[in-house]
């Protein structure tokens, strides 16, 4: 009969070592992400997880890919475009601290009723996802994202969060940021975009690889109405 007394401690020790290694790895990765967010307070991100993901997808599938990405100060993005994106993506952006629990509750109720019409992610959550996690979805990623959202709110502040988001968000195939989107779709600088153009651009953000501004008249009208209701 084999002696299992010596095997059990070995297995227990190996499991403990693995768990310890796993915890240390998670803590180190989280700390690195937090440091990147802190650095982003002063340094404009040169790239994001979404940018890298799209490059890899193009390389794997041997498809042509041209990246348009130019980071500009928030002051060079028209107020109309800033307001349109907030109205479309996160109406309570300036009221919450990273999570909009009101929207979470509505989304949960719609899920239960099978009538989901909108997401509950805030601009801060979307920024964290863009910077670190790409477009994939999983409970593990959601948990990691949620742990970094308060850090982003604390170290960056609302205006810097909005500035980075508007500059890195995907606005079409290979098109990142407000300046690139405005130049591509409207042949204009981001500072010169008016209300109608801004609403159409904001309307494509939920599905930037499928939508085009010229086809977003109905949704852009809703965004314009929201802007008016918000005093913009």
Predicted regions and their residues:
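Juxtamembrane regions of bacterial inner-membrane/periplasmic proteins
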Residues: 2-232
């Amino acid at each position: 009969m084999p002696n299992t007394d010596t095997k059990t401690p070995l297995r227990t020790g190996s499991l403990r070592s693995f768990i310890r290694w796993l915890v240390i790895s998670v803590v180190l990765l989280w700390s690195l992400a937090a440091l990147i967010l802190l650095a982003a307070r002063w340094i404009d991100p040169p790239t994001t997880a979404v940018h890298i993901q799209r490059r890899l997808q193009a390389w794997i599938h041997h498809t042509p890919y041209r990246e348009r990405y130019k980071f500009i100060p928030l002051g060079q993005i028209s107020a109309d475009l800033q307001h349109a994106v907030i109205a479309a993506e996160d109406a309570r952006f300036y009221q919450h601290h990273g999570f909009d629990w009101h929207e979470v509750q509505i989304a949960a109720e719609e899920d239960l009723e099978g009538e989901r019409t909108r997401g509950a992610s805030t601009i801060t959550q979307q920024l964290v996802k863009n910077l670190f996690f790409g477009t994939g979805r999983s409970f593990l990623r959601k948990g990691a994202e949620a742990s970094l959202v308060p850090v982003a709110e604390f170290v960056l502040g609302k205006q810097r969060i909005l500035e980075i988001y508007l500059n890195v968000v995907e606005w079409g195939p290979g098109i990142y940021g407000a300046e690139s989107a405005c130049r591509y779709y409207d042949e204009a600088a981001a500072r010169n975009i008016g209300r109608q153009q801004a609403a159409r651009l904001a309307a494509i953000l939920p599905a930037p690889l499928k939508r085009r501004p010229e086809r977003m008249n109905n949704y852009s009208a809703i965004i314009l109405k929201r802007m008016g209701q918000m005093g913009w």
